[in-house]
């Protein structure tokens, strides 16, 4: 059975959940943040009334989550973001992460978790060169924590990840601190690889990124269909990490979504409606491709799109959601 096309998006608590259109399939509540960088304890709070006069009460919020889930939508807790650095350096922090995240999921009746670790949350120690057998504590402990949560909640647990390109596709040319490189380069790869059998969607942020080398060994820049195609194709085709003989295996096409800013103001790398749909046509049908030709073949079951964010799109009168929902729904 074919996986339905999906449109995902982050929702900050400044926007009322009950008012989110049902065309969004997966809603990621942003953000759960740590009490300190290395505590492992995650907190999630409603927007203060001083900032959000129309914010729901906690009971209204829980009811809205229940109503969305009753319609088949998935509501997740998104952890991290630009300001939410999380470093699970110790087993104590790992265990606190598991217990606190589980507590939030249980309290609100959520479907799962989105990992949006940015900044210096993940990195690789010197000598940690094999993504299949990581040694760095912040990586090893995150993997163990995610496996514990998956085991606790079972098959229905939804797990998504929203890394930046620096932590994923950059791993084709640079991995970890070897040769004087940034220790964070490619550091999501061991997490993705370890969780690939349990990963629902990988939605790499195709914005706020520097140029990235694709499988054609050419630099690609944000804001173009070629960038979207090249970055998604690396995940579908797989790639040799740091150009060695250690290959990151392909993900299933239904695990891959393209992360985009929903408006020009939401992030550097906005792509207009035609550009996004040209990229999807190329990936799914092998049509409308630009200079980059996918190595991974056609992906008719490609998962869809992720937007940052519902809030931004609301202020643009759903300029992202409406045309792309219609486009994806036009496929059989």
Swiss-Prot record:
The active site is at residue 118. GO terms for cellular component: extracellular region. Glycans are attached at residue 245. PROSITE patterns: GH18_1 (PS01095), GH18_2 (PS51910). Its EC number is 3.2.1.14. It is found in: Secreted. Keywords: Carbohydrate metabolism, Chitin degradation, Glycoprotein, Glycosidase, Hydrolase, Polysaccharide degradation, Secreted, Signal. InterPro entries: Chitinase_II/V-like_cat, Glyco_hydro18_cat, Glyco_hydro_18_chit_AS, Glycoside_hydrolase_SF, Glycosyl_Hydrlase18_Chitinase. It is an enzyme of class 3 (hydrolase). Residues 19-331 form the GH18 domain. It comes from the Eukaryota. Coiled coil: none annotated. Residues 1-18 form the signal peptide. Degrades chitin and chitotriose. Belongs to the glycosyl hydrolase 18 family. Chitinase class II subfamily. This is Probable class II chitinase ARB_00204. It comes from Arthroderma benhamiae (strain ATCC MYA-4681 / CBS 112371) (Trichophyton mentagrophytes).
């Amino acid at each position: 059975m074919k996986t339905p096309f999906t449109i995902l998006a982050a929702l900050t608590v400044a926007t009322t959940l009950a008012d989110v259109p049902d065309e969004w399939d997966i809603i990621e509540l942003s953000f759960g943040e740590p009490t300190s960088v290395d505590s492992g304890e995650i907190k999630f709070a409603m927007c203060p009334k001083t900032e959000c006069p129309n914010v729901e009460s906690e009971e209204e919020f829980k009811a809205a989550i229940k109503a969305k889930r009753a319609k088949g939508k998935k509501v997740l807790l998104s952890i991290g973001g630009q300001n939410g650095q999380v470093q699970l350096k110790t087993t104590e922090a790992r265990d606190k992460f598991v217990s606190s995240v589980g507590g939030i999921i249980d309290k609100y009746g959520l479907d799962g978790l989105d990992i949006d670790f940015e900044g210096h949350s993940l990195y690789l120690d010197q000598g940690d060169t094999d993504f299949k057998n990581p040694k760095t504590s912040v990586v090893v402990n995150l993997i163990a924590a995610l496996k514990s949560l998956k085991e606790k909640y079972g098959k229905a647990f939804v797990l998504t990840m929203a890394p930046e390109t620096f932590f994923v596709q950059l791993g084709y040319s640079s991995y970890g601190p070897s040769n004087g490189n940034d220790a964070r380069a490619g550091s999501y790869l061991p997490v993705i690889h370890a969780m690939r059998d349990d990963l629902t969607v990988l939605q790499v942020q195709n914005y706020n990124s520097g140029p990235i080398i694709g499988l054609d060994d050419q630099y690609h820049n944000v804001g173009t269909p070629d960038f979207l195609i090249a970055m998604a194709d690396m995940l579908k085709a797989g790639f040799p990490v740091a150009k060695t003989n250690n290959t990151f295996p392909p993900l299933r096409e239904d695990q891959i979504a393209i992360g985009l800013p929903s408006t020009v103001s939401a992030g550097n790398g906005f792509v207009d409606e035609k550009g996004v749909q040209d990229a999807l046509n190329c990936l799914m049908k092998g049509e409308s491709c630009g200079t980059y030709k996918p190595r991974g073949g056609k992906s008719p079951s490609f998962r869809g799109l992720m937007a940052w964010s519902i809030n931004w799109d609301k202020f643009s009168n759903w300029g992202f959601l409406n045309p792309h929902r219609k486009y994806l729904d036009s496929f059989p």
